[in-house]
């Protein structure tokens, strides 16, 4: 009898140390820590970065410069809005604008919707749906188009992937509107679409290191605010 009890105790101890027992507990622990949102996002084919850290007024110099450059903006997109704090911030800087926040992470959107108001709304990041808005006066993409890898950057996040998403975002900007891309792995200025925009200067702000298209060479980022040039009408003569 004593041997049977001892064997049962040992079996229970081994079970508690097994993956079958520990894996669900580890997943639940990560959910409580907020790390589950990173897992959900990383499994999405259009995910560009894992961490979803955000805060109110996270980039005050950039927001102020953009507001000065587009004081009459009526519709603004926060691409990769995370849990919504950026949208609240933009609503303060652009008092006359409707703010649309979008994210691919449904858990982020659940948290973001507590910030909904008459001027702030949140939607799932469907390209087709965003195209249906008819353009934006400003598109903000802050710390989204990036990888946090420090080695083999081109392998984990090639420049072509960045350029493809940058092309989509710039297609949403109305002529005369702003495209704001900050804390990205690469520079918008190295894409072919750069020549249809002019640079808006920004007061001194924190600049993160970026890479050239080879994904190896580190370089200094340029200004992160760009104004889409209006088409030039050619005279018939």
Locations of the language-model features?
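Class I SAM-dependent methyltransferase Rossmann-like catalytic core
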Residues: 31-72
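Conserved SAM-binding loop of SAM-dependent methyltransferases across substrates and taxa
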Residues: 83-96
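Conserved SAM-binding motif I beta-strand of class I
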Residues: 98-103
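Conserved SAM-binding loop
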Residues: 112-113
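Conserved SAM-binding strand-loop segment of SAM-dependent methyltransferases
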Residues: 117-127
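A short acidic, Gly/Pro-enriched loop at the edge of an enzyme's catalytic core
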Residues: 128-143
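A short glycine-rich, Lys/Arg-flanked "PGG" loop and its adjoining helix->strand segment in the class I
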Residues: 155-178
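Conserved Class I S-adenosyl-L-methionine
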Residues: 189-219
């Amino acid at each position: 009898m004593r041997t049977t009890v001892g064997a049962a105790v040992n079996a229970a101890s081994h079970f508690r140390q097994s993956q079958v027992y520990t894996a669900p507990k580890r997943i639940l622990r990560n959910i409580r820590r907020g790390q589950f949102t990173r897992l959900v996002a990383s499994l999405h084919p259009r995910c560009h970065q894992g961490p979803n850290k955000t805060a109110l007024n996270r980039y005050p110099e950039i927001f102020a410069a953009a507001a000065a450059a587009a004081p009459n903006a009526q519709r603004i997109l926060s691409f990769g809005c995370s849990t919504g704090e950026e949208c609240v911030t933009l609503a303060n800087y652009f008092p006359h604008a409707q703010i649309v926040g979008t994210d691919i992470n449904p858990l982020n959107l659940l948290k973001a919707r507590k910030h909904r108001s008459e001027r702030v709304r949140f939607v799932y990041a469907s390209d087709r749906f965003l195209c249906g808005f008819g353009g934006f006066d400003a598109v903000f993409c802050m710390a989204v188009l990036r990888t946090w890898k420090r080695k083999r950057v081109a392998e984990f996040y090639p420049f072509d992937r960045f350029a493809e998403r940058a092309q989509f975002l710039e297609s949403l900007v109305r002529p005369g509107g702003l495209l704001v891309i900050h804390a990205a792995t690469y520079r918008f200025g190295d894409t072919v679409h750069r020549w249809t925009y002019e640079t808006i200067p920004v007061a001194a702000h924190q600049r993160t290191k970026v890479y050239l298209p080879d994904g190896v060479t580190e370089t200094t980022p340029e200004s992160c605010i760009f104004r889409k040039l209006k088409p030039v009408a050619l005279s018939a003569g």
